[in-house]
Amino acid sequence: LFKKLENNFEKCFQIHQIENTIKGKLSSILANAQFLFDHGLNDACLDKIKQARKLIFEYELFDYYEQLYWLEAPLIPKNKNFQKAHQLLNHEYKSIKSQNDIIKQYFDLSNEIYLFYMNHHFGSPQEQDFNYFVKHDLLKSNYELVPLKAQYLFHYAKTFLFLFEQDWNKAYLETEHQLKLFLKNKKYIDANEFDYINCLGNMLLRMLNPKRYERFEEIKLLLEIALKKYKNNDLCEAKRNHIHLAEWHLSLEAYQFDRALKVMEEMNAQMENTYKRNNISNYISMVYQLAISYFYCDKFMFKMS
């Protein structure tokens, strides 16, 4: 019975993904195209290929191009135009592969920098490693022609270099550059909801150290709208925590201690069970922040007793 329920849940989840995300829709189209191809229904397969091609190029979902290519290439009509059509498709394939390679390079580099930041954040850095990243060719500013995903990863990587140097303002500006890429390209948001929500949450965190709260209400609103549409509960809870945390800092900066206490009590009520279950260090931090809020409101001894 449990297995049956699990399978039904998985099917419902897959249907939801197909109906509600661009990537889910594209995956479904390509799966249907593969089925039609395998059964020799070439005309129907070509219709699906056309639909998939439109989504791939409209939303820069080049990860899916390889599958499209191997469906499309065998279906090129064997007539007098075959050679030209085959050459055009091969040229396109090489161009997309080149873009995917660029994205992969930025992805790998951004992961290396993130790990470097996490490993050395509380210790002494190896100067050679840090200089290697700072001088890396991929982190020079001539990136205008690369795909949006690579541009996003470019700024993501630089953010952690500036965080490592404790240059909070530059880290804020790099995260702001990431957000601009999304806000200028609505379709990029639709195809990359996870990255968009992460970026908005990170913007709230980046505000804290340079104390740049001028865009707080704007970012908070954008994040709340995005969270209503997104179904990853763990991510949504984490980003709601970022909203509470930024509101708490903003309230303390404005000497609005009662508001700060209210924000932290709301956060505690919302996140206590989740943090106890998944992230005890975040739970301890939250209790500490709650204690500070009580202290500022002259309620510390009463609440801690």
Task: Locate each region found by the language model.
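Internal metal/ion-chelating core segments
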Residues: Q105-Y230
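Alpha-solenoid helical repeat architecture
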Residues: E60-Q67, D101-D108, L145-L153, K186-L200, ...
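TPR-repeat structural position
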Residues: N42-D43, F62, F82, W168-N169, ...
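Amphipathic alpha-helical segments of tetratricopeptide repeats
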Residues: I49-F57, N90-S98, F133-Y143, T175-Y188, ...
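Acidic, glycine-rich loop-and-beta core segments that form the ion-binding/anion-interacting portion
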Residues: N198, N202-R206, P210-N232, C236-N268
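Flexible inter-repeat linkers and adjacent short helices
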Residues: L1-F133, Y143-L145
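Tandem amphipathic alpha-helical repeat scaffolds
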Residues: I29-D38, W70-N79, D108-S124, Y152-D167, ...
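Helix-coil-helix junctions within alpha-helical repeat/solenoid scaffolds
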Residues: L252-S305
